[in-house]
Design a protein with these regions (language model features):
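C-terminal binding/interaction regions
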Residues: 10-18, 23-25, 29-31, 42, ...
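Short, ordered loop/turn segments at secondary-structure junctions
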Residues: 40-41, 80-82, 109-110, 133-136, ...
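Glycine-rich phosphate/diphosphate-binding loop of Rossmann-like nucleotide-binding domains
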Residues: 24-82
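Short, solvent-exposed amphipathic alpha-helical segments in soluble enzyme
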Residues: 50-56, 93-94, 120-123, 167-168
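Structural motif
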Residues: 33-36, 76, 102-104, 126-130, ...
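Glycine-rich phosphate-binding loop
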Residues: 87-132
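Short, Lys/Arg-enriched N-terminal segments with co-localized hydrophobic residues
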Residues: 1-7
Length: 209
């Protein structure tokens, strides 16, 4: 006998999920603080740096809205296409506040990278940080009219987008501010080590490290 076909998640299923979570009136301490969305899973190699930055700051990924991880600060991620699944994009933006999101990082590529700026308009006043996945996506992401704000980083700089998201949260959470300061100090220390090595070893010795 043929195998049973595997069930597939539909766009309507995801919209129902988001709307149910929005209606749940969950404790903000248990909901994701940062939402990471991207237009395609092919954007993930660029967007992975955002996960790295948040993990370095002590965030944890939340994959179940009803069961938060032990970490106080969390993030979630979805693939949301502005062109192929516009209904999902609208649902994600419209439910952002009720679902407890404080900031959204949105990445998209191509010349019509509309996900970040459309999400910024829909989710307003939740801040959205746009990540152009490619250089050709920059103009599309930053091209917002007066009164429709979006924060954007340079092409491919999802790590910086995550730091900016953490800065937004740091205004209300001292623990995140402390982690940002510590991370900055670590990065400064790394530059100092390299600088001393170059000076003390000379260029030839430095290259042979």
């Amino acid at each position: 006998p043929s195998a049973e076909p595997s069930s597939m998640t539909t766009v309507d299923d995801l919209i129902d999920r988001l709307e149910a979570e929005a209606a749940a009136d969950a404790d903000p301490a248990t909901t994701p603080d940062v939402g990471i969305i991207m237009g395609s899973d092919s954007d993930l190699p660029v967007m992975e740096d955002a996960y790295e930055a948040l993990n370095e700051l002590g965030f944890a990924e939340q994959t179940d809205f009803d069961e938060a991880p032990d970490a106080r600060f969390t993030y979630e991620s979805y693939v949301v296409s502005a062109h192929r699944t516009p209904e999902l994009m609208y649902a994600y933006g419209e439910t952002a506040t009720e679902r407890g999101l404080d900031v959204i990082i949105a990445g998209a590529g191509g010349k019509s990278a509309d996900l970040p700026n459309m999400t910024a308009s829909i989710a307003y006043p939740v801040p959205v940080i746009g990540v152009p996945v490619q250089e050709k996506s920059v103009d599309s992401v930053i091209g917002m009219p007066t009164g429709a704000p979006i924060v954007a980083v340079d092409a491919g700089k999802s790590y910086n987008a995550a730091l900016s998201a953490a800065q937004v949260l740091a205004r209300e959470h001292d623990a995140i501010e402390e982690r940002l300061v510590d991370l900055h100090e670590d990065q400064k220390g790394g530059v100092a080590d390299v600088s001393a090595d170059l000076h003390d070893r000379g260029i030839d010795g430095f290259r042979e490290r």
